[in-house]
């Protein structure tokens, strides 16, 4: 009967869930053992050395240059029109682009015919990580953080790093923070006629936002970090354990940049059972078109992994993951600009310079960034005059695409931004 079938199915799913949970715990424990971590690090280093000797690395570099041009000129412009919130490219610096999402035309500081001032939309700059693409915040109309914030009356801009080629491998964090982001924020301030802009950083993008806010506090209205690692010594997620053990210079010597395929392999390896059974478990039950579209869109985003610029990856791993300099106020960003000879040794990123209001959003079930690492930021920003913390029952990506997040979290976050603007 149908009731018996439903009961059997329920028993099966519960058993399957239990087995997968136990298997994950076993693999997670084994993958953290010092012997395995060393083996993984040595294997990647040896593979990279072999690729360098045999010419595979050089072949990858040549192919990567072609792929970068194809992606930047054709794939990405087409991709940004599929199910996305309408947007315009308003600023471009080399491969970096600044986008502005369409909203009802309201000019800042204008007045209506009856003399009442039009309420201006506070400008917000979304800063994404170097891993994958920023469109996870605008994946589909039903689960779009961008649309959610636009509906609340915010003026949303987004930073897009583009697809780097191998000849970009020497770009540094300074290029991204003190040049690309700084010029973008100056542009936003000019076109919106405001003095300060709210920064909205997700994952590593939150770390870039922290760096910028510490170096240029006079241009930042509010600082919002989402699932952002703060105290890297507290980040005991599996990927962080592996990252600290990696001999990244071997990879960069062979491939120039950090290949996206290696990043994807690491993401899949940390949960091998779930990875191997993912599609079977999803399609074993009938699904409606909406859930299928959301699943496939998420999978597309997961594997849309551009390379990470070599020097930026080296700096981020060395300064943050291995030495934990950011939260210690000891991270130095080298000044690579041609017109600034007074800062030969660069500038120290001092989080005590962050005095503006700060909102920290944490995913309680985050297995990519330890919640304790993110939470430490509220203690580290000692001079912020207004600090808020939202802990949401979700995973890392669930913050962006979870239905409950769009009903509960983002209205609250949007309200916080408006109240502090």
Each language-model region and where it sits:
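Alpha/beta-hydrolase active-site loop
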Residues: 170-191
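Short, surface-exposed "cap/lid" segments of acyl-processing enzymes
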Residues: 85-165
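Catalytic histidine neighborhood in serine/cysteine hydrolases
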Residues: 317, 374, 379-397
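Low-complexity, highly charged intrinsically disordered N-terminal segments
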Residues: 31-113
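Conserved alpha/beta-hydrolase "acid-adjacent" motif
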Residues: 367-373
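Alpha/beta-hydrolase-fold enzymes
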Residues: 1-55, 190, 194, 200, ...
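Short beta-strand/loop motif that positions the catalytic acidic residue
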Residues: 354, 360-362, 366
